[in-house]
Structure formats: C-alpha cells, structure tokens
Amino acid sequence: MRSVIADSRRLVVKVGSSLVTNDGRGLDHTAIGRWAAQIAALREQGKEVVLVSSGAIAEGMQRLGWTRRPREIDELQAAAAVGQMGLAQVYESRFSEHSIRTAQILLTHADLADRERYLNARSTLLTLLRLGVVPIINENDTVVTDEIKFGDNDTLGALVANLIEGDALIILTDQQGLFTADPRKDPAATLVQQADAGTPELEAMAGGAGSSIGRGGMLTKILAAKRAAHSGANTVIASGREADILARLASGEAIGTQLIARTARMAARKQWMADHLQVRGHVVIDDGAVEKLTEGGKSLLPIGVVGVQGAFARGEVIACLNAAGREVARGLTNYSSAETKLIQRRPSGEIESVLGYMLEPELIHRDNLVLV
C-alpha cells in the first residue's frame, strides 16, 4: 500500500500540543525546528504546505507560571493570548533557518461560517501559498469561548483543507493511528491501515479523551477526516513521534491510518454550507420531504415542514431534521423563522395569500441544499 501523500501537492499538516511542547511545560523549540526542517523539505519537492499548530495555551501556561490547565474561560483566553506570541516567534525563527517566511493566521469557526469572511480567508491563504509563504494557523482562542471549551484543531485542519481545496490532511498525534479498539485495554486491537473516510464503523472504533494539555481525541480526528472528504481531501492520521514522518509519507511509505475520500467533491458553495459547525435554526420535515430530498434530489417546500426551531433570517444556513431529530440536510433558507412558521404545512400556492408576498416557491432550493 502506498501513501496518498506521495501524489498530493497541497497539504494541510496539523500538529498537536504534545508534539510541540515539553509535556505542557512551554514550547519544545527543538521539536518545532524539526517540523520546520521537514516542511522545508516538502516544499523543495514542490508541495504547498499549510501548518495548523496547537501549543499557544501550553506556552502561555508556562510563561504565566501555571502548572495545571485552568478551567475558567477567561484564564484560558489569557494563556492563549500570552502563548500565541511565543508560538509565532519560535516558528518564524525556525523557518527562517530555511529562508522561508511564515504568516500567522488566527481563525474561528465563525470566520468560516460567514460567506464573505470565508472567501476572504481563502483568498489570503491562496495568495500566501503563491508567494511561497508557510501559513501557521491556530484557532483564535483569545476571543472565542466555544472553541476553547469544545473545539479542537483537528476540525480546524479539516476546515482549512476544504477552504484551500487541499489534496490531503495530515493529522499528527502521539498515537500510531486508529485501532480497532483501545490498545491499552484490548491486546487484540489492530491498527486500521486504510479505510474510507466517513465509514460509520470508524466512529465506533474511535474513543478516549485527549491529554490534559491538548483537547482532541481520536474521535475528533475521524470526524475531521469525514469533513475533509467534502473537498476530496484524503486524511492520514499518524504518530508525530516517528522519525522524519512527513518525508517518509511523501516518499510513499504507508504509516498510520489512511482515510480515503471516496465521495465526489462537493461544489464550493455546498461545501461551505456543509462545513458550518453551528446553524442558526432547524426545521423538522415529514417523511415525504425526507424522501424527496435524499432520494429525489428535490427542493424543500413549505408543505413538507412540520416544525420550526430557533430564530433565523432569510439567507442563513439552517438544518433539516427528520422526525427522529437526525439532520438529513442543510441549506440556505429563502424565508425567516417567523415567516416559515406561518407557511409551514401549506402548499407553495398559498404563500402569497398568507404572507402578502412570495419570495420563492421553495423554502430551500435544491441548488442551495446539501445532504449530510
């Protein structure tokens, strides 16, 4: 089996906290130097690399003299603010040894949920790559609470892979890859060398929490691979403790777990909608509407809506739930939540008589709808 990285030109590399810190005691400058050297070697092979790096909070904790990760959000944000300075400085210094310029980009999921900001971020990243710069990306933990509390850079790496239409996402961790079971508890557990991204069984295999320094577990990596597949990006989950891991993957050596994107690449607009981690609201649809969306490729009409949840405006991304509460699709709504409540369960021909106007006959047009 050959590594998919060998034939990939545009890469997103995510390194976890444990691979760039001294077990939480600040940044490991030597380790970061090795990552810079490996990425420099990839660039000499003609590959473009975007680096998603954790480590800001761990560095901030060290600079502030804290030995335990704080629980209070404001203290986490303070640690991130202090640590981000050091993280940027070390990467700039180490990459400069290879005559490579770096750029710091701090993102939140909200940045990528807004269409205009999404396109601006994409344009900036592609320009940096064209200029030969290595973008260093991290979540903007200083201003966002949800990302610190629940988020992870595995997901961010997948979103960035989709943003720049990367060929592959490499998630480097302190584990060898995905096992069929927890190898610490099951001696019969074996490494999953290759599988299709999004296979339901993979989520059942994944489990366990991250360390006290980082936040990501194996499940987040499996879900990140599923998300990266939206843009056709393959994912490799491998141990960053392996010597020269990036060079070996680029040479074709199969290391860790390869998760292959088998589904067709989504159109850019639908990919953006699918990547929303949070939607503004939900509509519950009947079984007939579910069938028309999932099997017939039809638009969602008001008559198929049986319930409205949350507050949303026209043009926002909303989720479509079946009777069991499972999301089956999402898309851009033509009507607000208040308007939808008035026209639900009604045929499109009655919209104007109910509202006094009709913007569109569909609640969500099929061109603005994506199955999930």
Curated annotation (Swiss-Prot):
Alphabetically sorted, this entry's keywords are: Amino-acid biosynthesis, ATP-binding, Cytoplasm, Kinase, Nucleotide-binding, Proline biosynthesis, Transferase
| Binding positions (ATP) | K14, T173, D174
- Role summary: Catalyzes the transfer of a phosphate group to glutamate to form L-glutamate 5-phosphate.
Q: What is its main location?
A: cytoplasm
Q: In which pathway does it act?
A: Amino-acid biosynthesis; L-proline biosynthesis; L-glutamate 5-semialdehyde from L-glutamate: step 1/2
What is the name attached to this protein's record? Glutamate 5-kinase
Q: Which CDD domains match?
A: AAK_G5K_ProB, PUA_G5K
Residues of the PUA domain: 280-358
**GO CC list:** cytosol
Q: Which InterPro entries has this protein been placed in?
A: AceGlu_kinase-like_sf, Asp/Glu/Uridylate_kinase, G5K_ProB, Glu/AcGlu_kinase, Glu_5kinase, Glu_5kinase/COase_Synthase, Glutamate_5-kinase_CS, PUA
Q: Which reaction does it catalyse?
A: L-glutamate + ATP = L-glutamyl 5-phosphate + ADP
Species lineage: Bacteria, Pseudomonadati, Pseudomonadota, Betaproteobacteria, Burkholderiales
GO:BP terms for this protein? Answer: L-proline biosynthetic process
Which organism encodes this protein? Paraburkholderia phymatum (strain DSM 17167 / CIP 108236 / LMG 21445 / STM815)
* Residues reported in the UniProt entry to bind substrate: S54, D141, N153
Q: Please tell me whether the keyword Nucleotide-binding is annotated for this protein.
A: yes
Cellular location(s): Cytoplasm
